[in-house]
A protein has these predicted regions:
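Non-catalytic, surface beta->alpha helical segment in thiol-disulfide oxidoreductase systems
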Residues: 76-99
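Short pre-active-site segment immediately N-terminal to redox-active cysteine/selenocysteine motifs
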Residues: 19, 25-29, 68
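The canonical Cys-X-X-Cys-His
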Residues: 30-33, 72
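Structural alpha/beta surface segment adjacent to cysteine/selenocysteine redox centers
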Residues: 60-69, 73-75, 79-81
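Short loop/turn elements that flank and shape the SAM/SAH-binding pocket of Class I
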Residues: 11-13, 57-59, 91
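A short beta-strand-turn-helix
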Residues: 3-20
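Short glycine/proline-enriched coil/turn segments at helix->beta-strand junctions
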Residues: 18-19, 44-48, 98-99
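Thiol-based oxidoreductase modules, predominantly thioredoxin-like and allied folds used
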Residues: 4-6, 25, 37-60, 66
């Protein structure tokens, strides 16, 4: 299951981590975001996945240039390594961390 995080948790769990993780930038009102949810939950069985609500954490979304959602960003060592925008498949999500 994907863990919903806030701004403080983002700084410690994502930016402060040496591990690869995925962050799903979403909003509750976004239909494609809701459709991506089960895909991200499936990915979370094998990889670290966090969800960040862009309505609650506008500054972080702006900091990472999130203009459209859903937006999934892969991080490693606290830095962005890849991203995907829009409703995509599990295999497309996995490619973000395999490249």
């Amino acid at each position: 299951m994907s863990k919903i995080i806030n701004g403080e948790e983002f700084n410690s769990l994502v930016l402060g981590s040496n591990e690869v993780c995925l962050v799903d930038f979403y909003a509750d009102w976004c239909g494609p975001c809701r459709m991506l949810g089960p895909v991200m939950d499936e990915v979370s069985k094998e990889h670290t996945v966090y969800k960040l609500n862009v309505d609650d954490e506008e500054e972080i979304a702006r900091q990472f240039g999130v203009m459209s959602i859903p937006c999934v960003i892969a991080f490693k060592d606290g830095k962005e390594i890849n991203r995907s925008v829009g409703l995509v498949s599990k295999s497309d999500i996995l490619k973000l961390i395999e490249e």
